[in-house]
């Protein structure tokens, strides 16, 4: 009921309540039948019977069931709302309906009853209150027999809602062998009421109803008389014997001739003698004057008009649901594309920044003597090692660039992979790095070191040996813990001397969306071998030593080593001793 706004009560009875509600999204007015929560199974049985029928059968002259739901253990049936009934018409027209209107209504009611009977369905509660009438004059049969109409405050409820007035004699006597004729009897009683404005067999009890049936319609049949005499309810009761005219027009003088014939055919005491619904549709009352041929196009036009009105309401309700479904389909579709072709396109876009980054790292690694074709070949080996890091299984011929783009959210993984892989050959002989802040990183690197690339060519092996020779120039850079301060100072030296390399690395940082501070945390293990600028491609090992000596002389490279610490301690001791000697030699000032 969260989607509906309650506007008021339509009816209330022993089985449930009928509420007039408004859909909050579409504004459509509906009637919701709410069944009471009862421990007995009769309520659920009645509700499930109605739900099963309404879901199975659809007709222009039957009320439409919109939806069914259960809330707080109560069954809710949502119907289209038509607030006008034949009973309302009779209250407005006290002397009965006009003949043309009456014939149109009866024809539509018979169409609904014939549809039910053709499907072996018995309504069992046909009465003016259960015949809905739309504004365009379309009648629809409904089943609100479980609820009774609400009277004004202070008014007394009548027995009309019990529908006793329209019960066939076999139902009154509780005969178990009743069928479709009970609806025909109720139709005959309703026709008289619609034509005259007064109920034909109003009664206060079953015995009163039987007495009036005998007086106005006819005596009981032998079968029904036998049931009556054996019934303990009617024990000791004697019904009168009345002689009735056989002519229908004399029997029902207030009715039109043809209409009296229909009523007479409907109100037969023996159920086997009653007319069928299909025969009633072909009665002269409906076939004369070409009524059916004229009224059917009019009826279809009205039904089409109402369908258009309903179509203006229902798409509003279904449009939001359809939009949600379309969004879900789009989401599923885009996810599918991302997992297949779109992912490949995005990865191809990321190829260039990754290649640039690899080249810059090679410059940092001191591979200045490697030509460009060799770099491309080495990138193939690097991609194979990166593929070993990835979870996705790759074939030996697949390059890393086609696996996944760099992750800007977690740059440490990509940085470590790209920074360490160029030195994987030399790091095979490197002693374990014991860094307090990067144990996890060192462990990840070692896991990759013991899986060398199969695609490493002889040229890559030569570069590996050259990298080992370069690494042997400064053995302290591999064996000593550089520490975070040394890594920062090494960064400063590198930034001062390699302006062009900084520009390229800054471009790569923007593309990969990580800051310089993030790189400081992860790249310090190989900083000692990255102090060589890109412009020193043809330099020899001696020139590298000269650069490193000059870097030690600069103010920015005040990196304490073990030797420097010992020398500083000796200097401090010497200066301290000299000061004490001077103080001793100074004369005392009085």
From Swiss-Prot:
A motif ([NKR]KIAxRE) lies at residues 45-51. The modification Phosphothreonine is found at residue 158. Keywords: ATP-binding, Cytoplasm, Kinase, Nucleotide-binding, Phosphoprotein, Serine/threonine-protein kinase, Transferase. Residues 459-508, 547-590 are annotated as: Disordered. The modification Phosphotyrosine is found at residue 160. The active site is at residue 125. It comes from the Eukaryota. InterPro entries: CDK, Kinase-like_dom_sf, Prot_kinase_dom, Protein_kinase_ATP_BS, Ser/Thr_kinase_AS. Residues 4-286 form the Protein kinase domain. This is Cyclin-dependent kinase-like 3. The lineage of its organism: Eukaryota, Metazoa, Chordata, Craniata, Vertebrata.
């Amino acid at each position: 009921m969260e989607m509906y706004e309650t506007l008021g009560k339509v009816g209330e009875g022993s089985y449930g309540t009928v509420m007039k509600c408004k859909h909050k999204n579409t504004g459509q007015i509906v009637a919701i039948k709410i069944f009471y929560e009862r421990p007995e199974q009769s309520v659920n049985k009645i509700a499930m019977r109605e739900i099963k029928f309404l879901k199975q059968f659809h007709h222009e002259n039957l009320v439409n069931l919109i939806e069914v739901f259960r809330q707080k253990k109560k069954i809710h049936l949502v119907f289209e709302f038509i607030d006008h009934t034949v009973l309302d018409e009779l209250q407005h027209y006290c002397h009965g309906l006009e003949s043309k209107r009456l014939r149109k209504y009866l024809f539509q009611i018979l169409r609904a009853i014939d549809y039910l009977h053709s499907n072996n369905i018995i309504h069992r509660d046909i009465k003016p209150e259960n015949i809905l009438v739309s504004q365009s004059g379309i009648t629809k049969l409904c089943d609100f027999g479980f609820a009774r109409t609400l009277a004004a405050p202070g008014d007394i409820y009548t027995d009309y809602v019990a529908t006793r007035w329209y019960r066939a004699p076999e139902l009154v006597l509780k005969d178990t062998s009743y069928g479709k004729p009970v609806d025909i009897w109720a139709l005959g009683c309703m026709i008289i009421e619609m034509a005259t404005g007064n109920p034909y067999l109003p009664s206060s009890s079953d015995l009163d109803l039987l007495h009036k049936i005998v007086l106005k319609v006819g005596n009981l049949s032998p079968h029904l008389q036998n049931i009556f005499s054996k019934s303990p309810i009617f024990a000791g009761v004697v019904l009168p014997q009345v002689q009735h005219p056989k002519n229908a027009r004399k029997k029902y003088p207030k009715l039109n001739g043809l209409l009296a014939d229909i009523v007479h055919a409907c109100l037969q005491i023996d159920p086997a003698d009653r007319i069928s619904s299909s025969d009633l549709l072909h009665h002269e009352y409906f076939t004369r004057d070409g009524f059916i041929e004229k009224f059917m196009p009019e009826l279809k036009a009205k039904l089409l008009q109402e369908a258009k009105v309903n179509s203006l309401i229902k798409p509003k309700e279904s449009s939001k649901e359809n939009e949600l479904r379309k969004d879900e389909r789009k989401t599923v579709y885009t996810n599918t594309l991302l997992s297949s072709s779109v992912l490949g396109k995005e990865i191809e876009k990321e190829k260039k920044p990754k290649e640039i980054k690899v080249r810059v790292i090679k410059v940092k690694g001191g591979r200045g003597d490697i030509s460009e074709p060799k770099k491309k070949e080495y990138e193939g080996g690097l991609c194979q090692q990166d593929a070993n890091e990835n979870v996705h299984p790759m074939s030996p011929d697949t390059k890393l660039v086609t696996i996944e783009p760099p992750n800007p959210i977690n740059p440490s993984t990509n940085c470590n992979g790209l920074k360490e892989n160029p030195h994987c050959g030399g790091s095979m002989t490197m002693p374990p790095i014991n860094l307090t802040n990067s144990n996890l990183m060192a462990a990840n690197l070692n896991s990759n070191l013991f899986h060398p690339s199969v695609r490493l060519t002889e040229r890559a092996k030569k570069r590996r040996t050259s990298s080992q020779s370069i690494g042997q120039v400064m053995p302290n850079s591999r064996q000593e813990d550089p520490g975070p301060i040394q890594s920062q100072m090494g960064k400063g030296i590198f930034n001062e001397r390699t302006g062009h390399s900084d520009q390229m690395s800054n471009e790569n940082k923007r593309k990969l969306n990580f800051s310089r501070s993030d790189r400081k945390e992860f790249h310090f293990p190989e900083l000692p071998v990255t102090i060589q600028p890109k412009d020193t491609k043809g330099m020899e090992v001696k020139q590298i030593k000269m650069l490193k000596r000059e870097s030690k002389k600069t103010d920015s490279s005040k990196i304490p080593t073990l030797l420097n610490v010992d020398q500083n301690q000796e200097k401090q001791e010497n200066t301290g001793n000299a000061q004490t000697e001077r103080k001793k030699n100074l004369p005392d000032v009085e």
